[in-house]
Each structure stands twice: as structure tokens, then as C-alpha cells.
Curated annotation (Swiss-Prot):
Residues 382-407 are annotated as: Disordered. Internal capsid protein that is probably ejected along with the viral DNA and prevents degradation of viral DNA by the host type I restriction-modification antiviral defense system. Plays a role in directing proper capsid assembly. Its main location: virion. It comes from the Viruses. Induction: Expressed late in the viral replication cycle. Residues 201-284 form a coiled coil. Proteolytically cleaved into a 60 kDa form which is incorporated into the virion. One of its GO terms (cellular component) is viral capsid. It is found in: Virion. Signal peptide: none annotated. This is Defense against restriction protein A. Keywords: Capsid protein, Coiled coil, Host-virus interaction, Inhibition of host innate immune response by virus, Late protein, Restriction-modification system evasion by virus, Viral capsid assembly, Viral immunoevasion, Viral release from host cell, Virion.
Length: 639
């Protein structure tokens, strides 16, 4: 608000003014100029007048007499405001705007009173003089405010005290000197109300636009606040879900620990019982040990446990038995083999169904049981059959030099150095040779970043994982790898996979690479031209599989060996645990059901006495389900 100077006051008296002057455009533009022009588009309230005028706006009081404006007494204020509102409505006729309030009596909560079409506020002392505000509302939302002071009152305004109007506001803008610019001259009521009516009419359109923008802004802020509250509620719900999943994870880990503890107890008990069985087998229940069975002239007093042998073979790729015999596993021409060398030099060998860990473990068990029972003659290998494999000679390129370079002797098994160069401690011991990185067009160029390490004997899965090595298969093993994939993940969908290879070759390559890396995590997938050869081998294997399905061969003869009911249930349990390892689900109910089925599988393995040899598979399935729960938790928080 502008400062008021009583030297510029004037007298407004009732009288006849035939042509009262209207507000000019220049006068209106002057009011809309300056930093406080926004006050013209903000309606006023008694509370805001009291806050700004009574407390924040200074008034210059002078020693001269205050000139009379609209004057009345507190007792006659009702009639005075009625007359003023009536005159204002006459000037507003035809503008579509009307003045005055139809309220009467006290206004709730504000302490004001509605009289004569105006709302009268409470009197306050300003610089020692009592001041009384009044607001006349307009129908378009604007307000006209009039400020009265009482020159006769001391501390409080009584009914007989004189009230003098000395300041006018349109909305929040002080328009006193626009409404009554004739300093020192008398003005009629018609002149004042004409000026106020003109200002209200000129300002109405801008006021309505400003109020519309203000309402839109307020609605937007309200909506944003509601959205913020909704998102906070959603975050709170997600936090509760995270806490619930964490609790489920803790319960699962506790159950896994309980199963592991129980497995340890069973392992110790099995060790004790196995020792008793071995002792009884050696002595026949007598203190004097009878001669053990002979194979090739050497005693076969074996005290080894099959689970222990499988574990050592998995970790080291070889194992030494208690009677001095040795077992090892290796891959030749893409086929998996288990070899047992007796202390007398006899060699026994069995071929695994595939190079996958489960099939290799089955072959280990079959050969060991036959050897322990003395029925191993069918696996005897003639000397010429188990000679060391001939290493394919590397054809040296003709460099034009008169003296040929020495031929490098390399091992039969090649492993890509992915993460670090060959150095002591960086690769497993026993390597035959280190080859440089192949040319860029080589199928394994991307894998062998630091060259290729070769070995005469295959490395175990654990060694390849610990040293970040990848077995580089040769082209002659592609058919075997493709056949293994066909019997594995592609078995149920051979026909559809073959159609995909024909209709969408690119998608088939992606699917083949994904399943290859999942089935053979420690074997490199060939790139470049090698990819096309691998794809062709896979197509050939799928075509053969589809042909076998179309024209099935006669069922093979049933083996003589009968499987007990407990072993049959254990086999089903092992198959289910393998399927759990491939499970990819975001359904909490499905995962909970899987957890219950895993517990039933554990019980089946324990009943058949095969829990220990499949303990790693059980733990892997439990960890996989726990990882699925954690993935669901992370996905929920990101959302």
C-alpha cells in the first residue's frame, strides 16, 4: 500500500453532479504500472488489511487539521454504508457487476460485522489514532476497501464518535488519489462512486484472468501434493514388502542351515557305518581278515566312499583309491571319459553319456562299483586303445627362411586366458605350452585375450572357474556338443527349435548361444565362422532328433538290474532339483511351493541314502530359490 499524507485529504459531500468524470485510460495504466501492479488482481480481506495496514504500512500524520472525507458516526455507519453501496450500484448499472453483501450480523471466526452491505472490521490504534476498516464485496470477486479514522475517539470508538473515510483500495491497490485527485477541493459522492465503478469495470477482465490462473496453479499444487502423498504411501507399502521378503529370506537361510547341520550329522553317521561295513566286508565278521578278492593279481581291499571319490574327481579331476588305483576324468573329441588304472597297470575306461557334470558323476559311480565288485573286465582297455592321444601337429607356415623353426609341442586341451596373462600362480600347474592370442578371424579371438594355455589332461570345472579359463572345443567336437544340447534343453522343443532355425536364423543363433553358455558354463562358444558350423551341427542334431520322434526305434531291452522304490523316488527328486536350477519365476506362491517340494526331495534322498552325493545339488537349488526372492524384492523397490 502507498503511504497516506493527510495534507492531500479532501471533503466528499452529498450533492448534484450531472456529469461526474470517469477514470481515464492513462489513470488506469498508471495504477497497473510498477512492481505492485499485481495488487490490482488480488482481492482483499479484513484479515489482510489488518495485517498489512495496521502492522506493516506507515502513515504520515501531520500537525495540520485532517480534512473531512466521507464522515459519519459509529451509530450512523449502517446508513452511511447503505447510501454509499446504493450510489456505487447506480454507477455499476450496465456493467454486469453489483456491489454489497447480503450478510447481516456477526461474521464467524473473523470478529467482523456485516452491516449496510459491507463487512466492518474491528477498530485498532494506529500511531495513536483509532482506525476502522470496511470492505464492500463486488459480484465478480473484486473488493473495495474503505479505511475510517476517528478524530474524536481517545482509546476506543464509541457510538457517538465521528468516523472519517480517508483511504480507498480496489482489491489490494491504494486508489485514493485516483478516485479523488482534486487535492483541497470538495468532491461529491457521485464522483467518488463513478471513479470506483469505472476502475472496477476496467479491472474486471484482468482480475478474472488472474483468478483463473491462480485457481489453476492452486489446483496443480493440490494435485502434486496428492500425488506426493500417494507415492509416499506406495513407498511405505514397498518398504513393508521389503521387510517381509527379508524376513522370508532369513527364514529360508535358517532352514538351509538346519538342513546343512542335519546333513553333517548324517555324514558323520554314514562315515561310521561305512567303516563298519568295510570292516565286515574285509573280515566277513571274523577277527582274522580273509584274503581280499584279486584283480590282475593285486589285492582290491577298497575302503573308499563313492561320494568322497566323486567330490575329489569334481575338484581335482582325479582321485587315488585306498588300494593304490587311480581314477581320472577327461574329455576327448567332445566325449566324456572316466579312466581307472589298477596298481598292476591294467586300465579300465567307461564313456559318459555327455560331458555334463551329472552324467560324468554317473559314469564315475558305475565304473567304481564294477571295480569294487570285481566285475570290471568288460571295461578293460587294450594297451593300444589307451595310448596318449596324438597331438595334432601345428603346420608351420613357410616364412622363406632357410632354417626351419623348432616345432612347438602343445597339449591336447586348449584353454583361453580371459582375464590375465600366463604367470606362476595365474594358471593351474602342469601346462604343456602357452600359445599367443589367435588372429582376429579365429572363432575364439574374443575369449583368448591373453593367449591360450594347453594341457595334456583336462582341467576340472573348479580349476577353470577359479582361474577364469574357458575350454576351446575343436570343430570335431561340435556334433557331440550339439547332441548333448538336443538331449538336454532342446529335447522337448526340437521341432519348434528346428522351425525357428529355418524361419528366424538370427533368433535361433541367440537362443543357441544362450543355452550353450548355460549348459556348458566353462566351454567357449565359437564365434565368426565357428558359429555357423556350430549352428549347422545343431540343426543336424535337431533333424536327427525329430526323425527319431517321427519314427521311433523299438524300445531297448529292459536292464536286468531292478530299481528299488526308494531309488526311484530319489531319481525323481534329483530330476526335480535340476529343474529348480532352471526355474525363472516372479510368482511368490510358485516359489513357496518349490521350497516345499525341495524339502520333500531332501527327504526322498535321505530315505534312499543318496543325500550326501547330491548335497551340492540340494544347496544349489535352495540358493537359487533364495536368489529369486531377492530379485523379486529388488524389482519391487525399483518400481
Amino acid at each position: 500500500m502507498e503511504q497516506f499524507n493527510i495534507n492531500k485529504g479532501m471533503t466528499i459531500k452529498p450533492g448534484l453532479d450531472v456529469l461526474p468524470p470517469p477514470v481515464t485510460d492513462d489513470e488506469y495504466r498508471a495504477l497497473m504500472a510498477g512492481e505492485d501492479r499485481y495488487l490490482m488482481t488480488e482481492s482483499n480481506t479484513l484479515e489482510e488489511i489488518e495485517a498489512t495496514f495496521f502492522y506493516d504500512t506507515p502513515i504520515h500524520w501531520c500537525a495540520t487539521d485532517l480534512l473531512e472525507a466521507i464522515s459519519s458516526t459509529r451509530l450512523q455507519l449502517h446508513r452511511t454504508m447503505q447510501a454509499f453501496v446504493r450510489a456505487l450500484n447506480q454507477k455499476l448499472n450496465g456493467t454486469g457487476i453489483s456491489a454489497g453483501s447480503d450478510k447481516t450480523g456477526d461474521v464467524a471466526q473473523s470478529g467482523a460485522r456485516a452491516i449496510g452491505g459491507a463487512e466492518i472490521g474491528r477498530a485498532r490504534n494506529v500511531n495513536g489514532l483509532p482506525v476502522l476498516p470496511a470492505i464492500i464485496p463486488l459480484s465478480d470477486g473484486q473488493t473495495i476497501s474503505i479505511l475510517f479514522h476517528s478524530p474524536t475517539a481517545e482509546n476506543r470508538i464509541t457510538n457517538s464518535d465521528t468516523l472519517v473515510a480517508f483511504q480507498f483500495l480496489l482489491n489490494k491497490k491504494d486508489v485514493t488519489h485516483t478516485v479523488a485527485p482534486m487535492s483541497g477541493r470538495d468532491m461529491t459522492l457521485a464522483q467518488v462512486t463513478m471513479k470506483l465503478a469505472n476502475l472496477a469495470e476496467k479491472n474486471s477482465a484482468k482480475f478474472q484472468r488472474a483468478q483463473k490462473k491462480k485457481k489453476a496453479l492452486v489446483d496443480e499444487i493440490t494435485q502434486l501434493q496428492a500425488d506426493s502423498d500417494q507415492k509416499e504411501d506406495a513407498m511405505s507399502d514397498l518398504a513393508d514388502q521389503v521387510a517381509a521378503v527379508e524376513g522370508q529370506k532369513a527364514d529360508l537361510e535358517q532352514k538351509i542351515n538346519a538342513v546343512a547341520s542335519e546333513a553333517d550329522s548324517l555324514y558323520e553317521e554314514n562315515e561310521r557305518l561305512q567303516g563298519e561295513i568295510d570292516r565286515l566286508n574285509r573280515t566277513g565278521g571274523r577277527d582274522t581278515i580273509a584274503p581280499a578278492g584279486m584283480t590282475g593279481g593285486h589285492s582290491r581291499a577298497l575302503t573308499d566312499r563313492l561320494a568322497s571319490i566323486k567330490n575329489r574327481m569334481h575338484m581335482d579331476g582325479e582321485a587315488t583309491l585306498s588300494n593304490g588305483a587311480s581314477m581320472k576324468q577327461f574329455i576327448g573329441d567332445g566325449e566324456g571319459y572316466i579312466q581307472l588304472t589298477d596298481p598292476d597297470g591294467s586300465v579300465y575306461m567307461i564313456k559318459a553319456k555327455s560331458i555334463q557334470g551329472v552324467d560324468m558323476a554317473d559314469a564315475i559311480g558305475k565304473l567304481f562299483k564294477a571295480y569294487k565288485a570285481g566285475n570290471v573286465s568288460e571295461y578293460l582297455v587294450q594297451p593300444e586303445e589307451h595310448k596318449p592321444e596324438n597331438v595334432e601337429p601345428e603346420s608351420a607356415e613357410d616364412t622363406g627362411s632357410s632354417s626351419p623353426e623348432p616345432e612347438v609341442s602343445v597339449g591336447a586341451y586348449r584353454y583361453a586366458l580371459q582375464m590375465r596373462p600366463a604367470a606362476p600362480g595365474a594358471i593351474p600347474e602342469g601346462n604343456k605350452a602357452i600359445l599367443p592370442r589367435p588372429d582376429e578371424g579365429d572363432p575364439y579371438y574374443e575369449y583368448a585375450r591373453y593367449g591360450i594355455a594347453t594341457y595334456d589332461t583336462p582341467l576340472s570345472d573348479q580349476q577353470m572357474s577359479e582361474y577364469d579359463l574357458k575350454l576351446l572345443p575343436r570343430e570335431d567336437s561340435f556334433d557331440f556338443l550339439a547332441k548333448t544340447l538336443t538331449n538336454g534343453p532342446f529335447g522337448k522343443y526340437a521341432q519348434k527349435a528346428l522351425e525357428l532355425a529355418t524361419n528366424s536364423p538370427d533368433e535361433f543363433r541367440v537362443m543357441l548361444k544362450t543355452q550353450f553358455q548355460k549348459t556348458f558354463p566353462n566351454i567357449a562358444f565359437p564365434g565368426g565362422a565357428g558359429t555357423e558350423k556350430m549352428v549347422q551341427s545343431m540343426i543336424n542334431a535337431l533333424q536327427a532328433e525329430v526323425g527319431e520322434i517321427t519314427q521311433p526305434e523299438p524300445a531297448p531291452a529292459q536292464p536286468d538290474e531292478t530299481v528299488s522304490e526308494a531309488d526311484a523316488e530319489a531319481n525323481k527328486a534329483i530330476e526335480y532339483l535340476n529343474n529348480v536350477m532352471d526355474m525363472q519365476s516372479t510368482d511368490m506362491a510358485e516359489i513357496r511351493n518349490a521350497r516345499g517340494n525341495v524339502r520333500e526331495a531332501i527327504a526322498a534322498l535321505q530315505t534312499a541314502g543318496r543325500f550326501e552325493e547330491n548335497e551340492e545339488l540340494v544347496n544349489g537349488a535352495a540358493r537359487h530359490l533364495a536368489d529369486l526372492l531377492v530379485a523379486i524384492q529388488k524389482a519391487g523397490v525399483a518400481a
